[in-house]
Amino acid sequence: MPVLEVQGLCKTYPKFRLENISFMLEKGRIMGLIGRNGAGKTTTLKSLLNLVHPDCGKRTFFGLDLESHEQEIKCRIGYAGGAVDYYHRKKIRLLADVTKQFYPNWDETAYRKYLNVFSLDEQKTPSELSEGMRVKLSLTLALSHHAELLILDEPTSGLDPVSRAELLDIFTVLRNQGTAILFSTHITTDLEACADDVTYLAAGKMIASEPMEAFLKRGPSLQEIMVQYEKENLREKLAE
């Protein structure tokens, strides 16, 4: 049984449409969601969790439909997005105390472990943190309740190379423990270092969703595959 199955996800805005996105993610696998800026990655991730309400489509987590089991599902998921709205002048300790009330499986030992791993001072406020450290705070809160699935929007954005490498190592450890991870990124080398599967979006449409090994048969690297596709797409538009 897949940890996550998405069927026919659609969302329309005045100048953008997410069209018929379908993919599945198994336990203990990492899926990278790639695409250029504006491709629909963030809309897809937010639609999975009803942070954006899709126009159509079915989202199933752990065999449960999101529409009828949303609260139960969200207790089993960790989410971190680049635009998480914190109380910027409240101390991290207070944010953790508020967050843990929503998760029966909150683990204070795990919370303190990730504070140490990410060198976070819980007496500081988010307003005192750099962009990269705020990403680490998001991940600390997401990882502290033993989520079975992590959904992460650009988690390596703003991190220095050493911190990115450390985070990818953590992803690998979590995968080996059975956690499924879905994360968007424009840093394709991060995916090549740890992802099992790739879903590629372009202009709101799904171009491919398949194992990394199969996807890389299209070209020498994720970046080269994306650049080649986008170039061909541009040529077709110019020829119209």
Please give the residue ranges for each predicted region.
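Conserved ABC transporter NBD signature motif
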Residues: 57-68, 72-73
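Hydrophobic anchor residue at the start of the ABC signature
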Residues: 137-139, 159
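Helical segment within the ABC ATPase nucleotide-binding domain
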Residues: 164-177
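ABC-family P-loop ATPase nucleotide-binding domains
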Residues: 75, 81-137
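Catalytic Walker B motif of ABC-type/P-loop ATPase nucleotide-binding domains
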Residues: 150-154
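Conserved beta-strand
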Residues: 6-9, 16-26, 57
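The feature captures the beta-strand-to-loop junction immediately N-terminal to the Walker
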Residues: 34-36
